[in-house]
């Protein structure tokens, strides 16, 4: 049985299921919300170990938080870091199923 480092679960926070992410999945790409301090090598290692796939490349982006007004009260959204993971040919991840 393979052993998974518990820190990998801290790197990958959640899959992103949006229209744009669904279109990217047709091109062998998967989008994850990741920890803000996570680096590309950490993300690559976590995805390879957790999902048992080979990663070709990792691209990251940070969506800056915004100030919003809700019922007259000001609030702020946090920054969100996303990783677009490109998988090798023949590898797939189904994000609708759990780990």
UniProtKB/Swiss-Prot annotation:
Keyword Transferase: no
GO terms assigned for molecular function: rRNA binding; structural constituent of ribosome
Summary of subunit composition and partner proteins: Part of the 50S ribosomal subunit. Contacts protein L29, and trigger factor when it is bound to the ribosome.
HAMAP family listed in its UniProt record: Ribosomal_uL23_B
Keywords: Ribonucleoprotein, Ribosomal protein, RNA-binding, rRNA-binding
Biological role stated in the UniProt entry: One of the early assembly proteins it binds 23S rRNA. One of the proteins that surrounds the polypeptide exit tunnel on the outside of the ribosome. Forms the main docking site for trigger factor binding to the ribosome.
Domain of life: Bacteria
Recorded family membership: Belongs to the universal ribosomal protein uL23 family.
GO biological process: translation
GO cellular component terms, semicolon-separated: ribonucleoprotein complex; ribosome
Name of protein: Large ribosomal subunit protein uL23
Pfam family, one: Ribosomal_L23
């Amino acid at each position: 049985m393979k052993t998974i480092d518990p820190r990998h679960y801290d790197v990958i926070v959640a899959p992103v299921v949006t229209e744009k992410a669904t279109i990217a999945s047709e091109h062998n790409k998967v989008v994850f919300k990741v920890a803000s301090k996570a680096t590309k090598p950490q993300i690559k290692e976590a995805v390879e170990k957790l999902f048992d796939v080979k990663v070709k490349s990792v691209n990251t982006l940070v969506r800056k938080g915004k100030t919003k007004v809700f019922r007259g009260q000001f609030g702020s959204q946090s920054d969100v870091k996303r990783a677009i993971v490109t998988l090798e040919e023949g590898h797939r991840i189904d994000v609708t199923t759990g780990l």
